[in-house]
Amino acid sequence: MNREVVTMSTGNTLPPALAALASPLNDAQLNQLQQTVTQLNAQQLAWVSGYFWGLSQSNALSVPHISAGQTASAASGKLTIIFASQTGNAKGVAQALLKEAQAAGIQAQLFDASDYKGKDLAKETHVIFVASTNGEGEAPDNALALHEFLKSKKAPKLPNLKYGVLGLGDSSYQFFCQTGKDFDQFLENLGAQRLVERLDADVDYQAAATEWRKQVLSILKDELTGAAAVTSVATFAVSQTAESHYSKEQPYTASLSTSQKITGRDSGKDVRHIEIDLADSGITYQPGDALGVWYENRPQLVNALLDSVGLSGHEEVQVDGETLSLHSALTHHYEITAANPQLVAQFAELAQSEKLTSLAQDKEALREYATRTQVIDVLREEKVTLSAIQLLSLLRRLTPRLYSIASSQSEVGEEVHLTVGVVEYEYKGEQRLGGASSFLAHQLEEGAPVKVFVEHNNNFKLPSDDNAPLIMVGPGTGIAPFRSFIQERENRGAAGKNWLLFGDRTFTQDFLYQVEWQKYLKSGVLNRLDVAFSRDQHEKVYVQHRLLDQAELVWQWLQEGAYFYVCGDASRMAKDVHQALITVVEQQGGLNREQAEEYVSELRKAKRYQRDVY
């Protein structure tokens, strides 16, 4: 992930912007600082600047005042950037905008939405929101309170505010960029003026986001001038996990240590326990974080795709300014597995397909079709010959897959573990495989290189209080982060109670990490384990049913301050568990439905109800 930094130069003297300040340091301190600075490279300076800022915030130190005479010219205003992010993409875009604003001499500040008070918008002149969308159109957890405030009657009128919104989402889903659309509408309703039109960016958002930021900055240069970039600092707290310089854009080349199937021979699922060696990388992570994995497309799929549109793969194409063969571009740079509605609609027009054109006019049918097909299936709907440029114009750029980390570093050291469900099904008699999951499970041999990075997730974290009880709901591969939670709690010697609810199809074939859970039960680290195997009896039973079965105990734990976690499928499981939790609160707390919903909402705001759903 990118870190917000205050840019400093290297060399034998202090950076000019720093030297220009009325220094609060004595001569000895200045000399010591200068000697240290000259020994650091640009990357180290960037880290140190963020670290010292975090210290200054935690110790409530003030930033030195800069008078008009100490800067080139006084600022006519400042830019406030607010990010609403679930997995880190929106945060990364917001940090990039901050750096670019600083470089342009614009005074700017960056806020995590959870740290920003909505009423303070009345004091702002220029605000940019960068917002991702969680689940089925929900605001990310860090933006729930701000989202609720801005749509309430408590929100202030904002006639003096100019704003812009960049939404991130996936057009495959019905509520594409819904959180960005919400913030845009809220601000308009409050009388704010759009600085720039909202951008609804898809999965491959990088190029569109870069152009949008350029547009924003070209406007802001005329309206916000003169502030020294060194005064622009992020106000969100420095993470407890030191951020490495490896990121989505600059991943670390690790190696695959283990890929072990952990479902039974007769299971209908192929779930893998993956271990990746991070030795000498310096990468650190916390329970709740995710690992980003860059993958390569299967040669067989690339060849089939080329054959379907009459291309050889030897054609030369330009990718990011580099000349590549089409085969190489499809292998390393383009998404050729999952279909999406935009692909279907564009191919329908290009191929003049009546069938696909008719389908594209029905949004619900289009989404359903795109969900169950892959790119190759769409291209085979019509026999057409495409040019290399036409083919690439249909495709999204390849993006890494994020997997919930299934290990604690206090337990495994310089390794990271994943629990990966291999996507595998048949379509019209042919096998279809997921891109990243099949890469990890089938393409890579042990010892092979794999490019990875850590995506920190501050919205899914263990409580700082080791005495707090935990209730963890993780069916299927949703069990992954709770393996890391339990490992961490054991290594910390945490006294808090731990309760795990796991579900899958059958006890004998699909009980993931069964031996480990039994060990933790025996040792007392895990206080309770409830399981729901849906196909082991005539009537299907799921984790939400187990919650309702134990409603009295769930309520008791909540009253004792328990934290409630859910990981796994967003489309059905997470919704059903959410409704079951409300029912538990309603029945056991003696509340009506509306009051129970408010209680659960307050749990989320207090970060005692956290979800990692997908």
Curated annotation (Swiss-Prot):
* Major enzyme class: oxidoreductase
Q: What is this protein called?
A: Sulfite reductase [NADPH] flavoprotein alpha-component
Q: Where is the Flavodoxin-like domain?
A: 79-217
- EC number, UniProt record: 1.8.1.2
Kindly state the subunit structure of this protein.
Answer: Alpha(8)-beta(8). The alpha component is a flavoprotein, the beta component is a hemoprotein.
Residues involved in FAD binding: 337, 371, 401-404, 419-421, 425, 434-437, 614
Q: Give the gene symbol.
A: cysJ
Provide the leader sequence positions. none
Tell me how the cofactor is bound.
Binds 1 FAD per subunit.
